[in-house]
Amino acid sequence: MEKLVTQQVQNVDPKQSEILNISEIPAENPTETPIISKQKLLEAGVYFGHKASQWHPKMAQFLLKKKRNETHIIDVLKTQKMLEIAYKLVEKFAQKGAKFIFVGTKKQAKKVVEEQAVRTNSIYVSGRWLGGTLTNNRTILSRLKTMENLEKQAAENFQGYTKKEKLAKQKQLAKLQKNLNGIKGLKDVPLFSLIMLVADPLKDAIAVKEARKKGIKIIGITDSNVDPSLVDFGIPANDDSTKSITLIFTVLADAIASAKGGKKLFAYQSDENIILPEDPEKELKQTRYRNNSFEKFARQKNTLKDSQVLKPNTEIQA
């Protein structure tokens, strides 16, 4: 009989196991290709946490070290393990016919949220989350209907309207499309079948709160400053890096695609086939700051040799 994931991951919150039925998912075979190599996780910078003063105590089990005025380091081995479980959860839900809503309104998440949601025919919110998207469905559906009517009129070049009226309608349509394009499919999806995938539960706290009220399961990235109980299942990782978010969300999208017989882009692929985006300059500055803290931490604890510090192909030992 196959071992269960609950035997493999002893640190999973019992609440997560109960809500998401982790015990039903077979454990990985240690001889198989990892979902993402530790080297690739390092390259993506998933291990960068926040300053120790900003941490959330419930994330302690996923951190290598706590030191005041320094940066927390997330254990990449646990990130890898939890990402594997999250992949299997999403794949299992997709096989059972669940629909997904990708949520990431911070700039580092926008592109990957849109791309992977479109790729998997999922709903997404990458701009401002409109209050009541899930809890005041009638209002949202009314706006969607208005947008559809305007799109039909636009297809006919707003025939019968004056130039001034056309400009007003075009402006109204553009605004509606900006806010609602990603949730067009919401009108055809019963909320009980939705699973939310969120890049930052703190940034998108309203979305998380609404999902909670409607009983929608939530899988999300939990950085060192995030209360993991905000989501039903958390993946400990850096939520401020384009590379980190792209890596994790592409893997989750791979699970949906795999369940439908589609191609996997990152999950269980070789490192050379996983191309990550370049981080913007502002992120690079933040990364350099975190690198300095990590290098100091590594040398103090002799976790890595000086010649190994911060090289992408270096493994961090817990």
Swiss-Prot record:
<dbReference type="GO" id="GO:0022627">
    <property type="term" value="C:cytosolic small ribosomal subunit"/>
</dbReference>
<dbReference type="GO" id="GO:0006412">
    <property type="term" value="P:translation"/>
</dbReference>
<keyword id="KW-0689">Ribosomal protein</keyword>
<dbReference type="GO" id="GO:0003735">
    <property type="term" value="F:structural constituent of ribosome"/>
</dbReference>
<protein>
    <recommendedName>
        <fullName>Small ribosomal subunit protein uS2</fullName>
    </recommendedName>
</protein>
<comment type="similarity">
    <text>Belongs to the universal ribosomal protein uS2 family.</text>
</comment>
<keyword id="KW-0687">Ribonucleoprotein</keyword>
<dbReference type="InterPro" id="IPR023591">
    <property type="entry name" value="Ribosomal_uS2_flav_dom_sf"/>
</dbReference>
<dbReference type="InterPro" id="IPR001865">
    <property type="entry name" value="Ribosomal_uS2"/>
</dbReference>
<dbReference type="Pfam" id="PF00318">
    <property type="entry name" value="Ribosomal_S2"/>
</dbReference>
<dbReference type="InterPro" id="IPR005706">
    <property type="entry name" value="Ribosomal_uS2_bac/mit/plastid"/>
</dbReference>
